[in-house]
Regions:
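Short active-site neighborhood of thiol/selenol oxidoreductases, capturing the structured segment around
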Residues: 69-98, 113-114
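Structural microenvironment flanking redox-active thiols in thiol-disulfide oxidoreductases
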Residues: 94-148, 152-158
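Short, small/polar residue-rich loop motifs at catalytic or cofactor-binding pockets
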Residues: 54-56, 168-171
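Hydrophobic beta-strand positions
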Residues: 60-61, 176
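Thiol-/selenol-based redox modules, centered on thioredoxin-like
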Residues: 169-234
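Second-shell loop/turn segments in exported
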Residues: 85-87, 116-120, 144-145, 191-196
């Protein structure tokens, strides 16, 4: 076999090796229904379901700027609910964990962190605002990290009955809320509490936030396509 024939043979084999996975991706991407991993829904008593069966109730608490934040004002965003106080003994460790989330998604307007104060009497608007400004100075968008205070009894009742966090002494529990107000994950200090999760709490939460952000992107894509189809119909 001549050298030219050998080269043609090698080029042909290389082309087949490249073309086969490409055709496989096209076949399964176009002819099959695309699915991606998503998260279950978390309800009272840590019950899990594939369909939404619990939605956090509405709330109305003042943020660090004195503006009222509600559940409905967060619809359309994926957000982390954290419960602690700026006067907590382990505030540095708690903040460090949330800073990882904040920095990872600092340029994503659809991702937010919301702190529910566990000591409303000591968390003044001034201290809350200073805390937020210090930790969000590199954010690409404002209002990505909110600090809520208000009536102490009302706040604690909401944390227990709304966010389903019974132990208010454990500041290291975070809840992941999707764009519709459903709880999709619970994360602890070092242990990843949510069943079927991705591992360690913060890396696991980073991955899970990406999954819920994908849900938003797919929903918007489908809505845009439906709108385009409606406008092109005779």
């Amino acid at each position: 076999m001549s050298t030219r024939s050998k080269w043609k043979k090698y080029i042909g084999l290389a082309g087949m090796l490249f073309l086969f996975p490409l055709l496989w991706l096209v076949f399964f991407g176009v002819l099959s229904k695309h699915k991606f991993k998503t998260l279950s829904y978390l309800g009272p008593e840590n019950t899990l379901a594939e369909d939404p069966h619990y939605r956090i109730p509405d709330f109305a608490f003042a943020d660090e700027n004195g503006n009222i934040l509600t559940r409905d004002s967060l619809l359309g965003k994926v957000w982390v609910a954290a419960c602690y106080s700026t006067s907590d003994e382990h505030i540095a460790q708690i903040t460090e964990r949330l800073l990882n989330i904040n920095f990872k998604y600092r340029n994503e307007p659809d991702i937010a962190i919301v702190v529910f104060s566990t000591r409303c009497e000591s968390d003044t608007p001034e201290s809350a605002k200073a805390y937020i400004e210090q930790n969000t100075q590199y954010n690409g968008f404002s209002n990505k990290w909110k600090y809520l205070t208000g009536n102490q009894d009302a706040m604690q009742a909401y944390i227990r009955n709304g966010l389903l966090i019974q132990d208010l002494s454990n500041e290291a529990i975070f809840k992941l809320i999707d764009a519709d107000g459903h709880i999709r994950g619970e994360y602890g200090n070092t242990e990843y509490h949510f069943l079927g999760g991705a591992g360690d709490s913060i890396p696991g939460m980073v991955q899970d936030i990406a999954l819920l952000k994908k849900e938003i992107d797919i929903r918007r894509y489908n809505e845009r396509k439906a709108k385009e189809a409606a406008t092109t119909q005779p």
